[in-house]
């Protein structure tokens, strides 16, 4: 994510624009010169500049410092303070996303461990653990490829759903069972086409319901 200082407000902002992999952060030396979260991590020493990414990609700390200095000049602070500001803002943004899938869904993040994955996830995981009071913070082996690993090893599955705009007592047992059977056939169809035998299918059912007047399941 790219950090910038709007001319109108002079308040530090981070994202949603991204430098992507190309040109990428200034430190990647691929033509990028805009300050990014990655550059801020390098300036702060959270991402060491004396190692090579992937074993052969050199990190240019000087380029990262030059890029982040633009932010420092824009808001009238020092280089390190500007880098810290970038990281604090992006951490708060990620914390907001964590709240969407925890607190706002009725789950207390204090009851869960936090797993930091993705290429840069471990750089921010401890800070997010503190913000959300989620412990322990777990960094898996190969966090950058965890999603790909999960996709390659997960069980094949499909699902089907149906909505009822009615009170529970108005839905007859016969109709309900018939609809469950229909949903089972729909969810199983794609798996059978993919070569999964009917005997290996495992069917589970779930109902999301709400009280009268409730706005969410």
PLM feature spans:
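N-terminally biased helix-coil "hinge/interface" segments that flank
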Residues: 1-217
């Amino acid at each position: 994510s790219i950090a910038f200082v709007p001319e109108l407000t002079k308040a530090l902002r981070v994202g949603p624009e991204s430098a992507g992999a190309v040109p990428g952060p200034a430190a990647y030396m691929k033509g990028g010169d805009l300050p990014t979260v990655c550059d801020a991590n390098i300036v702060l020493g959270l991402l060491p500049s004396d190692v090579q990414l992937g074993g052969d990609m050199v990190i240019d700390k000087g380029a990262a410092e030059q890029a982040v200095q633009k932010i420092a000049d824009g808001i009238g602070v020092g280089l390190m303070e500007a880098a810290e500001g970038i990281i604090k803002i992006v951490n708060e943004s990620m914390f907001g996303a964590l709240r969407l899938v925890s607190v706002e869904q009725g789950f207390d993040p204090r009851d869960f461990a936090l797993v930091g994955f993705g290429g840069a996830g471990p750089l921010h995981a401890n800070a997010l653990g503190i913000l959300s009071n989620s412990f322990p913070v777990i960094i898996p082996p190969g966090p950058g490829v965890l999603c790909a690993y999960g996709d390659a090893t997960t069980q094949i599955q499909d699902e089907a759903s149906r909505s009822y705009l009615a009170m529970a007592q108005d839905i007859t047992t016969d109709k309900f069972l018939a609809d469950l059977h229909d949903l089972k056939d729909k969810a199983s169809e794609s798996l059978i086409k993919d070569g999964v035998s009917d005997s290996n299918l495992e069917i589970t059912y779930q109902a999301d319901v709400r009280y009268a007047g409730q706005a969410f399941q």
